[in-house]
Amino acid sequence: MDLVIVESNAKSKTIQKYLGKEYIVEACGGHVQDLPKSNNATWSNDDGHLPKPPWGWTKGAEKTVNKMLKKASDKNVNTIYVATDPDREGEFIAWRLFAIFTKAGYHDIQRVTFNAITKKQVEESLEKASDVDMNLVDAAIVRRLMDRLVGFRASKFANSW
């Protein structure tokens, strides 16, 4: 049995119908981890590398992911397919899920994407599974860091007028 993780409940129900009982299809609900909320958060980095902040759980995500981990354990899941959206944010979510499931002892984790929720597209994507695109992940991290470093401060400054 294999686990497929998508972002939304609606997608999970449709894809579950396509794949049948050989798969468990679960929704993560979008972002599972993000930058800490602290306004004073700072992160150091090695020269030439992006900072490596401690990623914190988003609201409700830890409970959702723990349910997926328990189900994966109970059903003796072999392969985990992370089928988040095929964009920068989807890639970031996939990267965080890879890290979480790897830490939990799962090693056969694959990235899949599809542009349409059709039976054919879903089945073809499982056959073409790959790894996370770290260029897209880096782009998502930079956007988050810039939002935090510039956006939060600019907002505070603008509100002080």
Question: Where are these predicted regions, by residue range?
Answer:
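Intrinsically disordered, low-complexity regulatory segments
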Residues: M1-W161
